[in-house]
Amino acid sequence: MSDTILKCTTRHVRIFTAVVENNDLILDNGHLTLDIDPDNEFSWSDQSIKKVQDYFRELVELQADNELSDYTLRKIGSLLEDFIRKLLKDGELSYNPNSRVMNYSMGLPRTQELL
């Protein structure tokens, strides 16, 4: 295993081979930490967070027999990013109007005025 923290960073997903202790990442090759939407671009319900977490667990289990690598983490991160886009498109997630920046990174909101 690696002596450095492996990580995947997308716009809305961060995955680390680490645990969080006192706001610091501590290397732990037997543990993956998932940080969802670190910039709070979206308004999340408990149900939508659970869906992302469950899908994350499913993706990790599918990779259980493979060596953990940067590529594997990037693949999981990309699939989670696509899943979040689907939640937004399906209306299970919405943009956070109190977000620091409104950049609509996954496309304009689907409203009656824009359809």
Curated annotation (Swiss-Prot):
E.C. no: 7.1.1.-
GO MF term (any one): quinone binding
Primary localisation category: membrane
Pfam families given in the database record: NdhM (PF10664)
Keywords carried by this UniProt record: Membrane, NAD, NADP, Plastoquinone, Quinone, Thylakoid, Translocase, Transport
Catalysis: reaction(s): a plastoquinone + NADH + (n+1) H(+)(in) = a plastoquinol + NAD(+) + n H(+)(out); a plastoquinone + NADPH + (n+1) H(+)(in) = a plastoquinol + NADP(+) + n H(+)(out)
Gene Ontology cellular-component annotations: plasma membrane-derived thylakoid membrane
Subcellular location: Cellular thylakoid membrane
EC top class, as a word: translocase
Membrane-related topology note: Peripheral membrane protein
Family the UniProt entry places it in: Belongs to the complex I NdhM subunit family.
Biological role stated in the UniProt entry: NDH-1 shuttles electrons from an unknown electron donor, via FMN and iron-sulfur (Fe-S) centers, to quinones in the respiratory and/or the photosynthetic chain. The immediate electron acceptor for the enzyme in this species is believed to be plastoquinone. Couples the redox reaction to proton translocation, and thus conserves the redox energy in a proton gradient. Cyanobacterial NDH-1 also plays a role in inorganic carbon-concentration.
Subunit text: NDH-1 can be composed of about 15 different subunits; different subcomplexes with different compositions have been identified which probably have different functions.
Protein name as it appears in the record: NAD(P)H-quinone oxidoreductase subunit M
Organism: Prochlorococcus marinus (strain NATL1A)
